[in-house]
Amino acid sequence: MLNERIQPGMIFLLTVSLCHFMEYRAVQAGNCWLQQSKNGRCQVLYRTELSKEECCKTGRLGTSWTEEDVPNSTLFKWMIFHGGAPHCIPCKETCENVDCGPGKKCKMNKKNKPRCVCAPDCSNITWKGSVCGIDGKTYKDECALLKAKCKGVPELDVQYQGKCKKTCRDVLCPGSSSCVVDQTNNAYCVTCNRICPEPTSPDQYLCGNDGITYGSACHLRKATCLLGRSIGLAYEGKCIKAKSCEDIQCSAGKKCLWDSRVGRGRCALCDDLCGESKSDDTVCASDNTTYPSECAMKQAACSTGILLEVKHSGSCNSIVEDTEEEEEEEEPDYSFVISSW
């Protein structure tokens, strides 16, 4: 009698449990992906055994889902050999509730697919003219710079208004920053460190290219900043009255080059390999010789032991005009690391 009463209840509980288990499996089955490629396949696996609802609740554009519950070996083959998983279902078909993050907005493209595009808020920008970025490039306005920042240069910022210049003339730096022309003859706005600790070791002394001994790298950077143009490092240690490069001891990997104009030597790296030069890379050096590039000029200096410096870009026979490029091909070093040139 007892068994007859319990058996129907047990069957009911087993049936309910089985239904819940199958429902759980049906909801959980599937894989969540972070993006959908141009070929329509899902890429960058986020999690397995995830329902579409859970996968798509983030609101992130690009998140996609596949229904197939397949072993890891199949997922591996899809990702490595087939460019992603087939039957990819994008979470977002429209821009509704899409979160693109700051400085971006969702927009339907020509294929009627939602895409996040750069759309910085430029409504509060008062200066409408060109600006010079900290990358040494000129942008037509601050809004264009913000778009470039959005597209992959997160550290990009405005350093001063107007086109990037080769001199500090007419450069108005914001706040307490000062204009400095670096060793590549580009003007930058930097904050001068006016307090340097006193040297505690003779190893901290540096000889500048101006023949002055500085207490440390901090003191040399400070002098550079206050002067408004690069001084550069001649060699480590206090400056000496050298008669030739034989009197100067360079650190490993450097060679002494003699500056005959001032009767001083400086240590320089001489292991640079020069790549293929472009026609607009030519420079006129201090020996009035045209070199295919600044690198080639440095190689010539290293081979002769005589210091060469750039007089101006282009051929020595060309007419030099004070022009300002809209954009530089190469991004100059604006960190003011002390170098030998």
Curated annotation (Swiss-Prot):
Glycans are attached at N72, N124, N288. It comes from the Eukaryota. Pfam families: FOLN, FST_N, Kazal_2. One of its GO terms (molecular function) is extracellular matrix binding. GO terms for biological process: cell differentiation; negative regulation of activin receptor signaling pathway; regulation of BMP signaling pathway. Induction: By activin. Monomer. This is Follistatin. It comes from Xenopus laevis (African clawed frog).
